Swiss-Prot record:
Keyword Disulfide bond annotated: yes
Gene Ontology cellular-component annotations: host cell endoplasmic reticulum membrane; host cell plasma membrane; membrane; viral capsid; virion membrane
Glycosylation sites: 270
GO molecular function, one term: structural constituent of virion
Residues on Extracellular side: 260-288
Transmembrane region(s): 239-259, 289-309
Protein name stated in the entry: Polyprotein p42
Organism: Influenza C virus (strain C/Taylor/1233/1947)
GO process annotations (BP): monoatomic ion transmembrane transport
Superkingdom per UniProt: Viruses
Length: 374
């Protein structure tokens, strides 16, 4: 079953490719090891009219189907760049979960339940591409199928076919994911109750969106509710950043002053018409000074540690060279690949509606219940 789903998602991914090229790739995927090897060699030698991203994606699919196909440096570099920001602990956790997933349904459920980011999904793809023999065929095919489904759903072509209610549902999903961050700041004084209230509201909105899917009447109300929740999420995030300094300040200024100072303060306050007087006792002054010095020292230590980490990354781990390479490829991409992609884009635009395409009318796999799927 997973193999059939992989073929369907591959056809959807290659929807804008020339029909002859698409037929060649699909025939190779369904034709066995030797056919897949031949097609992978054609892709690697750039003998098929595919853009850079399409070529690397198809090579990854074929190698995961048949590990005997040798890895392609271009695809490996793309995967390394996509996962460069991922922590090692996250990578270990993902590998453990992949081996326990079992098949396509297990892999997809893992992605949905954990709400994986793009770099986490790419870590899974990199694992089955670099070490295909460490995983069963079901896990390899399941990982690649889930990845292709994710790419298809994120494409502009896919989003343009989603209804207004579908877009609303996707926005609700983003708000619900953002609200889970409230768990991290729920323990901060003054924000716990607000965070729990916000989570309840977003969950209610998600349920309401599912119930009113396709309803034109409820859409404006849902849009307003989404904007309100998004604004509160952002405001609470900004409040959480300020609380560290605010708590230090209030922990000092809220201490009880001596009776003498309190009387003096009240007297000065009553005798002042246009000036507000705030009195600090001597101990509070010392504590504020120490707090300011402490924050300054912590900031300097943080910067020093960051500098040391960057030096270690540069000289010991050799990451500077890779970063420079990334910057170079971003500013000055490979001219040959860029020119080839531009030429292919123009060719496809020139063909327009004249190109025969038997799958133009076939819908991309998508269901109402699948709105919140990865």
């Amino acid at each position: 079953m997973a193999h059939e789903i992989l073929i369907a998602e591959t056809e959807a991914f290659l929807k804008n490719v020339a029909p002859e090229t698409r037929t060649t790739i699909i025939s190779a995927i369904t034709g066995g090891k030797s056919a897949c090897k031949s097609a992978a060699k054609l892709i690697k030698n750039e003998h098929l009219p595919l853009m850079s991203g399409e070529a690397t994606t198809m090579h990854i699919v074929m190698r995961c189907l048949y590990p005997e196909i040798k890895p392609w440096k271009k695809a490996s570099d793309m995967l390394n760049k996509a996962t460069s920001s991922l922590k090692k602990s996250e990578g270990r956790d993902i590998r453990k979960q992949m081996k326990a997933a079992g098949d396509f349904l297990g892999v997809e459920s893992m992605m949905k339940m954990r709400a994986f980011r793009d770099d986490q999904i790419m870590e899974m793809v990199e694992e089955v591409y670099d070490h295909p023999n460490d995983y069963t065929p079901d896990i390899r095919i399941g990982t690649i199928t889930a990845w292709l489904r994710c790419k298809n759903k994120k494409s502009e072509r896919y989003r343009s076919n989603v209804s207004e209610s579908g877009r609303t549902a996707l926005k609700i999903h983003e708000v619900r994911k953002a609200s889970t961050a409230m768990n991290e700041i729920a323990g901060i004084t003054g924000l716990g109750e607000e965070a729990l209230s916000l989570q309840r509201q977003t969950e209610s909105l998600a349920i309401l969106c599912n119930h009113t899917f396709g309803s034109n009447i409820m859409r404006p109300h849902l849009e307003k509710a989404i904007k309100g929740v998004e604004g509160r999420v952002g405001e609470m995030g900004r409040m959480a950043m300020k609380w560290l300094v605010v708590i230090i300040y209030f922990s000092i200024t809220s201490q009880p002053a001596s009776a003498c100072n309190l009387k003096t303060c009240l007297k000065l306050f009553n005798n002042t018409d246009a000036v507000t007087v705030h009195c600090f006792n001597e101990n509070q002054g010392y504590m504020l000074t120490l707090a300011s010095l402490g924050l300054g020292i912590i900031t300097m230590l943080y910067l020093l540690v960051k500098i040391i980490i960057e030096l270690v990354n540069g000289f010991v781990l050799g990451r500077w060279e890779r970063w420079c390479g990334d910057i170079k490829t971003t500013i000055m991409p490979e001219i040959d690949s860029m020119e080839k992609d531009i030429a292919l884009s123009r060719e496809r635009l020139d063909l327009g509606e004249d190109a025969p395409d038997e799958t133009d009318n076939s819908p991309i796999p998508f269901s109402n219940d699948g709105i919140f799927e990865i």
